[in-house]
Amino acid sequence: MSETAPAETATPAPVEKSPAKKKATKKAAGAGAAKRKATGPPVSELITKAVAASKERNGLSLAALKKALAAGGYDVEKNNSRIKLGLKSLVSKGTLVQTKGTGASGSFKLNKKAASGEAKPKAKKAGAAKAKKPAGATPKKAKKAAGAKKAVKKTPKKAKKPAAAGVKKVAKSPKKAKAAAKPKKATKSPAKPKAVKPKAAKPKAAKPKAAKPKAAKAKKAAAKKK
């Protein structure tokens, strides 16, 4: 009898990560670290706020500055070098004035001139932004005014119709005036009786003529008596 050897099970080879995936994971890790760093405000802003909040006449010392930053939740021990660099950069820019010591180991005070100069441009920008908003709002008012003008233009059409009706009524009124003028013909009729009166007076003038025969008869009677 021939013996059959058991078949060897093939073990899967370990899958190597592609270099593209490694780069992607590194980028993601770097982005996460950058986000963590960017979440908090920069050191320069924290330093300026701490110095501005101090009421010391001679300025805020480095030790007092570190205490103020630590009270605000900033890790002073890890970021000691950053604090020193931030102080030097702010002094070079003119934001802070060094009243004592040299370098980062001294007392620092806020430069009022620089602070006022920074505040003025911000105020100008805010004023310009406010001025732009009304400029954008004016066209709406102009549109409303234009709509009102259109409404005013439409109204005269309605006003014209009553005017035309008034003209028609005025045109009809002369007919009534003509009807009122007809009674003038009736006034002419009294003139006819005036012409008739002289005709009636003629018989009165004829009566004396009738008296003449009486006189003749009287003369004849007188002659007979003789």
Curated annotation (Swiss-Prot):
UniProt keyword annotations, A-Z: Acetylation, Chromosome, Citrullination, DNA-binding, Hydroxylation, Methylation, Nucleus, Phosphoprotein
Sequence positions bearing N6-methyllysine: K27
Residues that bear N6-acetyllysine: K17, K49, K78, K168
Record PTM text: H1 histones are progressively phosphorylated during the cell cycle, becoming maximally phosphorylated during late G2 phase and M phase, and being dephosphorylated sharply thereafter. Phosphorylated at Thr-11 by GSK3B during mitosis in prometaphase and dephosphorylated in telophase. Citrullination at Arg-57 (H1R54ci) by PADI4 takes place within the DNA-binding site of H1 and results in its displacement from chromatin and global chromatin decondensation, thereby promoting pluripotency and stem cell maintenance.
Localization per Swiss-Prot or TrEMBL: Nucleus; Chromosome
Biased composition (Low complexity): 1-16
Biased segments, Basic residues type: 122-133, 140-161, 169-187, 194-226
Keyword Nucleus: yes
Principal subcellular localization: nucleus
Region (Disordered): 1-44, 98-226
Listed SUPFAM superfamilies: Winged helix' DNA-binding domain
Record has Zinc as a keyword: no
Modified residues (N6-succinyllysine): K37
Modified sites of kind N6-(beta-hydroxybutyryl)lysine: K37, K55, K67, K88, K93, K109
Annotated positions of the Phosphothreonine modification: T11, T39, T138, T155
Modified positions (Citrulline) in chain numbering: R57
Family statement: Belongs to the histone H1/H5 family.
Domain commentary: The C-terminal domain is required for high-affinity binding to chromatin.
Biological role stated in the UniProt entry: Histone H1 protein binds to linker DNA between nucleosomes forming the macromolecular structure known as the chromatin fiber. Histones H1 are necessary for the condensation of nucleosome chains into higher-order structured fibers. Also acts as a regulator of individual gene transcription through chromatin remodeling, nucleosome spacing and DNA methylation.
Subunit structure: Interacts with MSX1.
Protein's recorded name: Histone H1.5
Source organism of the structure: Homo sapiens
